[in-house]
């Protein structure tokens, strides 16, 4: 590939051109002290070539003029031949490109010589100058077109196989009240679990490397001819358009601040999730590759390379920044916590990348804007986290939760907390200077992990303590003491299971787990006592009369019927806990009933015994099944 250097070719100069060049030499000699090194070199080359053709003085052979004239015309002709040619020189081959650059260099050399003259006084000089100027303009327009065509035709896209924005799983959408985020969807809830891994500053070729020498030759030629601005405008235009197309490929829409503030939660949730992926791809991959391309082409013009890169990337960067700025204007609602955490974490992660992309003063505004956005996201995320606890405390109920099952608030809070360990480093950083009362005093021991007393761990335990207080208040809405115990048992058991079966365990600690296991087991005991103590008392022997025994048997059956009708509507969703309750109750009730009948069945009389031991045992299995209405009572065996 031809490059612009100090070689001066003998190009199609006619007799007038030789005479003009002779004037150039004289003018340059007269002002030799004012010439830079390049122009002095040009002077020497001109003298050498003119001498070669016998024109060091005013006499020149006719044969020399004829040859020079022919070559001058060929140079102009070659430049004009590409004026309407729609193909690219790169496609035409290396030889064609070299010949074009050689012709351009010849014309530019003549123009440099003419510009050194104080003025062009005769028509001959004007004609030659005009011919060279027109040829140069044609060449520059053609190179500008060549640049755009080659960039378009040899553009490469960042491979989507490792940068796909759309996840293979669906987004989790949090309801704005505490009624969503059930166990069935929590598996899909974390934004971290399947995030595509993006290597730090993975440079992908945005343009086929095979054309880079050609593009660089175009840049050198246009810069040498003082057409640097048209080159930069064309280059910036094509690359900015390519970046915009890539943003569309990533499905990152441009939103105004008003758009973001008016979005419903489902749309905003999706847009925030997409932003966290796109901003990493753009800063860590695409713009890193774009900066590399600018340096490869314009590395010899460092300040211009930087300016071009900033102009190419500015619109896309501002679009991403504006979205982030608009998001932090939204209210700090609890359901937005995980999204804010994701945006903050990504914004903090890419700051090093942004600093590397825009290290100079010319890019300082973009660099500072990213740092400011990260700070705003940090503040907004912290406020949202603290308001999450307040929202739990203020969640009041006026009616008891049906069946004493696991309250929506408990599911929401615990499943939400399960997401947070993935943000441990970020939350520890955000919460380190915010004091909170903790239910677990700090102590040391082999079974105590340091993470148990991290800022995040203390705050999470405090949130659960607030949840427990809310559940205690909700339990007071039940008139039935047994159902109150079932409600607390269910919800405390649920909390323990969520902590034991997730990363929350290393944050809450085994002591917290033991304490809360004891708490729900205490509620099991309270349930059994409030439900069965008075009923089982009917089965005790006091040397009663037959009439009294029959009355006790009748009252037991009535009390058992009442328990059956009520507690088959109650809910114990945890199958293991439900089985344990069935076994525990069966041991106490069936054993007592069997003993009572064994001692007194003959005296009571079969017709006064409504249920057998097998009936009681089977009916107990229906308890806590949350039936819409009680099944028909087991067949009574009235005799």
Curated annotation (Swiss-Prot):
Q: What happens when the gene is disrupted?
A: Unability to recruit a number of exocyst subunits to the exocyst-positive organelle (EXPO).
Q: How does it assemble?
A: Component of the exocyst complex and of the exocyst-positive organelle (EXPO). Interacts with SEC6, SEC10A and SEC10B.
The protein depicted here goes by the name Exocyst complex component EXO70E2
Q: Which family does it belong to?
A: Belongs to the EXO70 family.
Q: Gene3D superfamilies from the entry?
A: Exocyst complex component Exo70
One GO CC term, this protein? exocyst
Keyword list, A-Z: Cell membrane, Cytoplasm, Exocytosis, Membrane, Protein transport, Secreted, Transport
Q: Which Pfam families match?
A: Exo70_C, Exo70_N
Q: What does this protein do?
A: Influences the subcellular localization patterns of other exocyst complex proteins (e.g. SEC5A, SEC15A, SEC15B and EXO84B) leading to their recruitment to exocyst, well-defined large punctate structures throughout the cytosol. Essential component for the formation and the recruitment of exocyst subunits to the exocyst-positive organelle (EXPO), a secreted double membrane structure also called extracellular exosome, that acts as a sequester for cytosolic proteins to release them into the apoplast.
Name a biological process GO annotation: exocytosis
Q: In which tissues is it expressed?
A: Expressed in roots, in the root-hair zone, both in root hair and nonhair cells.
**Origin, by domain of life?**
Eukaryota
| Species assigned in the record | Arabidopsis thaliana
Example GO molecular function: phosphatidylinositol-4,5-bisphosphate binding
Give compartment(s). Answer: Secreted, Extracellular exosome; Secreted; Cell membrane; Cytoplasm
**Broad class of where this protein is predominantly found:** secreted
